[in-house]
Each structure stands twice: as structure tokens, then as C-alpha cells.
Amino acid sequence: MADKDAQDFLKFLKSNASTDEKTRCLDTLRSFFNKNNIPNADLGLFVECFRLALTTVNPLLLRSSVACFETFLRRLRAQYPTWLKFRVPMLKNLVIDHIASRDLQKRVLNILIDLWHFNPSEIEKSLIHLSTTSKSAETRIQCFKWFVLAHNAHLSFDVKSLRPALYINLENANPSVREEAKEVLLLIYKNLSTSAKMQFITDVETTSGLRREILQSLVEELSLISSSSEVIIVQNSASSFQPAPFMTAVATLYPGVELENVKPLLANFSKQLEQDSASMLPAFEGRETEQNWSVRQDSVLRLRQYLRGNACIDYLPELLSVLKTLLPGILLALLSLRTTLSSSAIQLIKEMAIILKSNIDPFLELILPNLLKVCSVTKKLASQAANVTFAAILVNCGVLSRNLSFISLAAHDTNAQLRVFSSNWIFMLISLSPELKNLASLQTNLKAFEKLICRGLADSNSQVREVYRKSFWKLSEYFPSVQEELTNTLEPSVLKQLHLANPNRQAASFNFSGPKRAPIRPLSNLRSFSKSQKEETSSNSSNSSGTRRLGLPQRATPASRERVLPYTRSQAFHSTSLPPSLPSGHSPSIAIPSKRSVSATIKDESKTFELLKNIQRKYELILSGSSVDLPSAEFLSSNLTDALYSGSSICYSLIFSHSLLDLTFQYVDIASLLSQFLLCVYDPSNVGHSFALASFPYVKSHYDAHKYFPIVFDVLMNISNMAPHVKVFPFNTNQKRLIIHGCLLWLKEISDTKLNQLENKPFFVTDKLRYYSSKILAMTAKTKLTSKNWIPLSGLLFSLRAHDTFMFDGLLDRLNEESRTKLVSSWSKQDAFDYSKSSTHQEHLSKNLPTLNTSSSSNSSQTDLLVPHGKGETKETEMQSPIESKEGLLSKDTHIESPQGTSLEKENEEEGKNPVESNCSEESLDDHNIDQTLVNKKETLAQDSESLLQKNNALNEKGFENQFGLSSSAAKVLNKDTLDHVSGPISNSVSSSFKDFTRTPFKEINGERETGFELTSYVNALSKKDDINVQKTENVDESVGLNAMFMDNVNQDSLNSVDQSSGKDKLLLTSSTPNKPTTFFMPANEEILGSPAKDYDIHDQSYSVHELHSENMRENVGQSSLIYNNRDYMNTPMNDFSLSFSEIKGGILESPVESPMTGTISPIDADESVLHDIPAYESLNKSESNKYQEQAYSTPLHHTLNVLPKNKWILSRMHKMENGSPINVDKNLDDAVAALEAAVKELNDGSVNTKTLKFCIKVCKETPSMLYHSHGLLPAILHYIESNNSAMHISDCLILLHEFLVQGYQGVDMHTYHNIICILIEKAEKCKDEPVILAGIEDNITLIAEIADLQGLYEFTQQRLQSLNTETGEKSAPLLLMLLSAILMRLKDLEFLETKDLLRHVVLKYIDHTNPEIRKATFNVCLAVNTIVNNVDETFSILGGLNEGQRLLFMHYLKMKSDEKN
């Protein structure tokens, strides 16, 4: 159609032609649109024609006009989509007025749907506006019908903008409008999940203001609840946690145990619980005030309502998580002085126990101690409520054995009220055993009940005694044997009152005359009672010195009724006498260690930490020659003792450093020091385990072995309660077992490796050896074969026997038959030989040896360890003569195990057991049969030992000198020491009465090759101070290193990391040199703890033995890597370790974004806007831009960096932004370019939306070549980030910046990278409380460190760090340090001198900074340096100036990062 025809048609429509003619003309035009294209010049004329035709009121002409207009739009959509996109508002207005017409409404709705594809927001806004402002009900209805059509056509319109219009029309006066609006709401939300539906209902309740009837109708239609009402849900949910049947019986004893009436509260969705808990947390922070106590009470009440609702059924995991988060606040409310708040918290805990039952078992460790505190208060209301709650917990949740431990604490408390409550709890547990169905558990813990009842029957409070009498008879009903056992141990007065309280006692007869008298007891009872009184008298007379038997401290029963005074502080902690050669500057402390709980205040721990740092600094200055005075001896004694028992990991990192250990040896009682130190070494769950383990070699080298032997022996005797004057130690039974384990291993180590060299020393005399052996032999009677301490004990005795066999056999003959058989049988199974005693020397020694017993008391009721010789002597067992060597080591079949996990701690949880004992039954051992194969094996080992000895002798001085480059004098020393260590046991074995080869922990034989290795001491590897210290270390025999065993041209690939003899995992330490690879073995945890001070090294740096003698040999030490095959190496919980004191106890709330920049932020004096004048962003000029961008964007990049965000939230958001239909550049290039330019404009104007950012990200991701057509995208992104504060859009812009840099990094120069970093740092300072923005900033800075030019970026970072002032900003320093660590990860070596200078400057400046973020970033820099050099010692030398505490912290941080990777 020509231009003239379009003009003629317009004139025809304006003329007065008839309607039929106009209709025919429109039909002809419609047919033309279906078959032909529309000329571009005629578009405006046709639009004007339709504007005129659609304004008519004639229905026939209007219907033809709408039909022709629909065809016209269909042709435009195919021919001119771009033209149509920008004319949607004009075309929409032509037909939207006819939406209410019955004949035209269907076509009009279809036209609007066609226009929606080109401009969705315009169509939606117009319809929403029309639905709320139109006075025509039909118009509103048709607007809603359009949304129904759009929903059925799966068009993603904006529901959030539509909801307010629907809420308004739900209140419309026209019922048809209300129904249509309701239908749209139901259509949108009926297919969603229940949680989404409940979220919608919650929003309607809070924002819409609808009437209750309308809201109830919506809820019913969405099928959320039944039509009856929501009360049905509450009743059904409440019925599911009705109290158990036995609660009725409990209610008879405790009337207040029933649940109170509380209005239930429904949880609509899981997020509701988390949102409510987040709003409750601020109320429980800080101290209780007049303003927040009511808020706390409301929070507690709301939790009780949730428990009564559906949360415990539908959202149990979320509810438990909320309760765990709020548990500290609930306990604060429990201990409140306000009775109202405290009672509410008590009721909450009671309802938790009744409703949640065993689900709250993990919380009981915190709840029960605090409940005991409330039970002991004088407020009757609070104490009685706590009493009832404790009873409810006992019958509903928790393990009986663990609950009994808390009841035992209450029963032994000085508060009479608490003892009365505990007696009632015991009676309840016993009497309700059938209802609780725990008779089996009751029988398992029968001993604990018997102890509590025996103590309660003699309690000073009459109420307590009365209840325990009832408990006694109730327990006797279920276990009749208990009555006979307990009555034999009770006093007559107690038995008399107990008999009177017997419920089954027959009533006395009154039909007799005469005075009343007590019943006549049988003669047998009288005899047994007289005998027990004699034994008790003799026991009291012999035990007057306070000696106690093996086991826990027991209350001695005095012979008279006089009151026994407790130990005084000085008597209870009697100091061990030190050898005369020990330092005598100050006498050791005799103060009792502070028994502070782990829950000590943060302020006190921080004060202790700072105090230790000051003491360490002063002591190091004194060592360096400065004139500084230490505090007084009393001050050092008390504070070092408190720090030793503080239980804080940060304090242990200092107290177990070498300098403070020296002070601790001088000012703290050595028994207290060694007992606590051994506990830390052998308890992997202790927070000081890793630090004590690292310092163990240094502690061993502090004194000579012959001086340590009596000290460790005294600790062993005191811990096992076998000393004449027992000291009081603040340890429980399990801890004492661990200390005993460590003492036995240490004594055996000294006996095996050191005492052979002391035959001419004053220590090595027969009398002392006899004394030590007799005392240790006494421990065999109370140590069971299945105990973890049995193998170390038997190994120690076997080692002591090797020094003087004649004397030891005499002691062994005096031992009772049972203990002697058990010990000898254990030796035979361990070392594969029979043992027989000789009657010739038995008679000789029996006259001179003292009588040996397991305790100092002479109680005749106990079995003596030594069997008296004479007529009553039993027939001796015939055994062969022992074949042995002086080494006397245990065979490899009996490798002494060190503590692994908490196996030692789990042997016996009862406090009443001896720490040397085990609860397991003894094994029956057979020590009379010898397998012939073991004898053959012995001969084979003897032959191997001879061949190995010949090879070792072949290593002469010249060989050492040639192989290791040592001087002749050094070779002599080394050759002598090495051969002593290597061939000493072998030569002794060969020269002894039999040729038996004993295994050492650091030996492995592969085929015919003998391999050895040497690991230096951790003390020397961690801190090599100067030549004086090295020389001093050489002079000390104990700290020279391990047994020097060198490899003899062995292929190291054949070495295994598992000890073939014991099956224990080893830590493999590999060191490679250019000429000859060398592989060393790192001993596992059990061998580290059981070996001498010189026999192991836990440092991850490998050294050769000649490094101790020549500094020049350090060059041959290559890079090493440590493979952690043993998880028990440094088994410190991560939550117990931190880089500073503020990070130990400071609670950091977890944010949705895991960003190292988030968390607790230290307060600052002034905000920092910029570091200095940040240069404005300068874009490239046109020529430079064309040069770079033509190179980068002329064709799609085939090489895309694989750099993904490390933050999970950002990565998820990026994937969500990338979803959608791909961009088709071939067909819509002009449109895409226009859209990209529009996006740049929106970014510059600050009016960008999510859809625009999503489009830009897809452009960068899918079609990077389009970036060539837009020169201002990067400046626009940076401008928007710098000038806007919308968190969501800023985070999306940071994602866009990430994608732009990944795809277009080749076109960005270094100056632009500098500007980007400056803008990001400035933004981080402004948005330091926005974790999402901080995570995006960190991601982009890390990306820039990966893609930018390394030299230019390093120079920029160096300049910024040197001019940085951390006092005016909080985020600048962490970000720059993070950038520096990322730059270092790209380096292969630190070849520039200025690099090392910068690292020293940065680390020394920020490693002790008050801001935890800066400290963590500094340790990451240290970690990056260690990754480059792959050598911890070289890392310390590069950083320089780090003290021992900082080095230990870095070692622990390195281990923590290694565990995270694994």
C-alpha cells in the first residue's frame, strides 16, 4: 500500500461515509495486513487511523477496528519489534478503555498480553492502577482476569506489586470484585508449599489490615487448617506430647510437676522460629536491668508457647537449634534474683524436659548445675520449683549414671536443704523403677546407690536420714542382697534406727509385762561385731599418719569420738624435697592451685594473659643482660600456679613456653607442675595438650634423668594415694589415671635408657632401688590386667628388675601369690619366656627385705601382698630360670600405648574407684606354657642383631666425615654417640646371657636393609637462638636428639609409614635434596609420649644429625612437607584455640555470609573516610581504549579464567543472576547494544534495577565481544559502587565487576586496577556492617590479585601498607593484608630483599594488633610465606623477631588450616 493510500484511508475515516462502507474498508485493510508488509513511512498514518477508528461509539465499526488493530500489532511484532517496543504506552492507551466491553474484552485482553512481551512493567502498572481507581466494577474484574490469563500462560508478572491492589479489592463493596480478587490470590498461592502459604498469611496479617473473616476464608481455601478452626491443630499437636503415664506417679511425690496452662503458639514456617530467636537475643545480652528483665520474661513465655504449639512436631530440629542458641539467656533468667523471671525460666526447663524428653540430653550438662544452685537458695518458691524441675528431668531425660553424679554433688553439699532434696530424688528413682522401666540401669549403678545410701544414713540432718531409710528398704525389695551387704558395714546406732523404719516390721506385742528392752541379737552377730571393732581399732592406730589406700581419698574413721581436723593449706600441699643440685634461687611454692572453673570471667583471663606476657618479657630481658627486676617470689608463685591451672589455651601457650617454664620450675612446686603438665600431655581433650606436647622434650632435658626419677616417683605415689603424707590435688579420678599413666611411662623411659649409665652415681644404690621397686610392686594388687596402666606398670617393673635381678626376685617372692602370678604371667606373654624363682637367693633376701603391703594400714581384713615364710607357706611353683639382658626392654608384642582419645577416661566414670584400677574383670593368664616358635624367633632375632652390630661398627670416623662433611673431631663425637645409641641395646643383648634383640620405637627393617633416621628436638627446631644455646644443647646429653641411625644407600620409596611391629600410624616427614632423597619417620602420638626427650620431634622441619654440629650443613636441608596421618598429633579442639584472648571468649554471631571481615568489630575513635587522596577514576583515551579493547573484545575470548567466588552466597547469587534465556547477538545485535547503553546510563544515574544488572552479567558471561561497543561500562560500575548505598544492588554490582574483570582483564591497565582497589577499600570502610558487600569486596580484591600484573600490584600494596594508619580505619588494613597474602601465593620464591623487609615490617606491626581481623590477616600472610618456602624454620627466619608464644600460635594456626584442607 502506497503512502497515498494510507492518507486516503485516513480521510475516508474522517468523512461522513456510512458505517457499512467504513467496516468494509477496515476488513480490506485487515486482509492487507495479513498478506503484505507495512511500509515504514506509513506506520504513523496507520496509528492515527486506529486512534480515530477506536474512538467511535458504533459497536459494529468498533468491533471491526479492534480486530484490524489486533492484526496490525501481529504484523508489527514480526516486522518492527524494536519500533513496537518503544511505542507500547501509546498503543496500549488505544484499547485499554474498551476492556470492560463484553463484545471486545476477549480481544482487548489478548492485545494487552501481546504488548506485555515488549514492555511488561508498563502493562502491569496500567492494569493495577485501573483495578484500584476505576469506578466500574466490570473494569476491575477484567483487569484481574488479565492476570489470571497471564498466570495460565506462565508469564512472570510482579506479584508483589499486585498484592496491595488485591487486598484493596478484597474489601470492595461489589461481591463480584471481591470474589475475583480472592480467586487471583488463591490461583497464585494454592500450588505453593505450606511454608510459603504460611509466609503469605503472615504478610497478610501484618500488612494488609484485612478483616478476620476474610483472612479466615483465605486460610480455609488454601487448605491450611480445617473449617472448624485452628484450635483443632493445637489440640492435636498438644495430644502428641501428653505426659508419660509414670508422670502420674511422680505427681504423687511432687505435686507441682504437672504442666501449667499456657496458650499455644503456632509456628507457621521454620524461618519464623529463627526470626523470633534473633529478636530475643539482644534482650539476654549484658546484665539484667529494669528495662530488659520484662523483655526476657516475655521471651521465655514465647518459648513456652512454642513448646505447646506445633513447633515440637513439625519443626523439631529448628526448635532445638533455637533453644541451644538461647540456652545461655535462659540460664541467666534462671539465676535471676527476680522471682517472677526465675520461676518462668524454671517452668520452661520443666516443660522442655517433659515435652522434648531425651532431645535435651546435650543441654543437661549446663542446666543441672544451675538448677542445683537455685535449689540451694533460701527463697522457698524458687527452690521448691527447681526441686520439682530437677525431679522431672531425672525421670524424663538424661542417662542415669550421669544424673547420679549430679545427685552425688548435692548429697555431699554443705547446704542442708540441697541434701534433703537429693535424698528425695534418690527415693523417687528407686521407688519408681518399675514405672520407669530402668531396673536394669538401676542394677548397673547399684554401687553408686549403695554409697549414697550409706552416707545418707549417717547424715547430720534428720530429714535426710529418714528419707534414706525409706530408700534403703525400697532398694532391698528389688535387690535383697543389698540389705545383707550394707548392714554389715553400718554402725549399731544406724542399724537400730534403720530397723525401726522397716515398713515390713511386725508390730510389737503389748500383752506382756515387764520393762521394755531391745531384742536379743544372735551370738554370731555379736562375734562379728566384736571382730570388726578390733579390726577398726587396729586400722585407726596404724593409719594415724594419714596414709590412705589406693583409690580416691577416703574419710578415715577415728578410733575415738573426737573431731578430726581437716588438713591445713600447708599440710595438704606438702612440698616435695628437691635434689641439692636444683636451682635454689627461691623455694618452690606450697600454695594450693586455684580451683577456678573453666567458666571464669573473661576479664580475669585477659588479666592473666597480659600478666604472663609481661613476666615473659622481663625474664627474656634479664637473659639478654638487661637490668630488669622480676616481681617478688610470692607474686610469681601465686600467679604462675593460677595460670598453670587456669584451663585457658591462650595462657597455656605462654606458660608452656621455654622461658616461663624455667620460671615455673623455680617458683612453683615441682609436683604440682609435673602433675598438671603430664595431664595436659596425655589428655588430648585438654586445651593445653598441643602446647605441652611441644614442650615435653624441653621439660625432660631440664634436669638429669637420675634427678627426675625420685621426683616423678613422688608424683606417682601422691597421685595414687600411696605416699605417707598425701597431697591434695585438684584432679578427678580419670585425670589421676592419665597422670599415673604418664608417670609410669616416664619412669620406664628413665629406667630403660638412663639408669644403665648410673651405676657409679650416688643414686644407684641397692637400698634406693629396693625402696622404689617395693612401692611400685604394691600397685600390682590394685591394677587389673585390662587396665590401660597395667602394661606400663608391668613394663616398668620388668625394667627395674634388669638392674638387680637378685634383689628384685627376692621382693617378688614376698609378693602374694595372686599378684606374683599375674605379673609373671604378663611378662611371659609379653616377652615370650618363662620365669622361675630361685630358692637359693630367696632365703637370703627374705631376712633383709622389709615387709611389703599395698597400704600403710595393717588391717587384718585385707589380703597382704607379701606372703610370710614359714610353716604356712604354700608350695612354690616350679619355673625355669630367667634368661634376660640388662636392657630388659619390653618386646615388640607389648608396645606400651600412650593415651588415644579418651579411652583411658572412659574406663570408669565412678568417682569412688581407685585411679590405678579398672572396672573390667581380670583375665586369667597362663604363664607355664612356652611356644617353641617363640624360642626360634628369639634365636633369629639374635642373629639379626649380630649382623646389624657388625654393620654399625663398620661406620668409622672416616665414614662419618666423608658422608656428612664433618670435621674429624665432630666425627669422633658423633660416631661415639651414634654407636652408643644404635648399638648399645644390641651389644648389651649380645653380651648378655641370651641373644635377644629388643625393638626400639624408631626402627624398621625392610627385607635385608636396616634403616634409621634422626629427628631433632622440637625445642631446637622451633627456636634456634644463637651459637651459645646450640653449644649448650650439645653439652646436655638428654637434648642431643634422637638415636642417630643413618641410612645406608637405601631406596626410600620402600619405607612404609606404618610400624610393622606395632601397627601404629606414623607421621611421614620427607626431605629431598638434589643428590640423594632422604625420608624420615615422625613417630605417632603414643610413641612421642612414651619415648625419651631426645627420641622424637614434632616439628614439621626435617634436619640431619650433623646440623646440630655444623651450621654450614643447613644448606643441604631441602623443602619438606608434613603429611598428617595421625589425627591425634595436635588434637586440640578448634573452638578452644584462637589467635588472641579477645577471640577466645568473644562470641561472634554467625552471619548469612561467611566473610572474614565480619564478626565482632573493635570500637574506634574516629571513622576513616579515605586513606589519603584517592585518585579519581580516569578512563583511557579513545586511541588507547580502541587499542586495548580491539585486542580484548574484537572476538569472543576463547580463554576464560576459572576464577569463581569463594563465598557460597556470592556464588549462589551469581548462578541465579546468570539464569534466563541466552542473548542472541546475531539476530538482536542492535537491541543488545541499545540495552547495554541504557544499562550504562542507569548505572551513571543511580537508577539501576536487578533486571538491568542481570542483563549486564549475562553480556559479560556469554558475549564478551559486546563490551567493545560500550566504553563506559567499567567507569559506570565503579561510579555506582562509590556513590550508592543499596546493599542488594551494590552486591550485584560487585558480582558484575567480578565478571567484567574475569572476561576483560586484558583490557584493564594497572592504573585502573589501583583505582578499583581504592574504591573498594573506601566502600568497605563505609559499609563495614554489611556482610554481603564485604564479601563481594573481598572476592574482587582476591580476583585482582590473581589477574593483575604482579610487579605493579606489589609496588602499590607495599606503598599503601607503609603509609597505612590503622587507628582511623578498621577495614583497610585487613583488606590490604589479604591482598598481600594473595600476591605472595603467586610467587615462587622471595627473591627481592625489599619483599622480606616488607614482610618483617608488616608481621611485627600487626601480629599483636588489638583488632582480631588484622591479626587473622597477618597470620594468613605468615601462612603464605610458609607456603612459598615450605619450611617453618625458614619462615621464622624471614619474618624475624617473633617470640615463642607467637611461634606456637602460628604453628597451631598452621595445623588448624591443614586440618581444614583435609
Curated annotation (Swiss-Prot):
UniProt-reported outcome of changing residue 747 to F: In allele peg1.1; abrogates bipolar spindle formation at 36 degrees Celsius
Any one GO BP annotation for this protein: mitotic spindle formation (spindle phase one)
Any one GO CC term of the record: microtubule organizing center
Coiled coil start-end: 1342-1367
Cellular compartment(s): Cytoplasm, Cytoskeleton; Cytoplasm, Cytoskeleton, Spindle; Cytoplasm, Cytoskeleton, Microtubule organizing center, Spindle pole body
Regions of compositional bias (Basic and acidic residues) in chain numbering: 870-896
Keyword Cytoplasm recorded: yes
Protein role: Microtubule binding protein that regulates the stability of dynamic microtubules. Required for mitotic spindle formation.
Protein name according to UniProt: Protein peg1
Annotated source species: Schizosaccharomyces pombe (strain 972 / ATCC 24843)
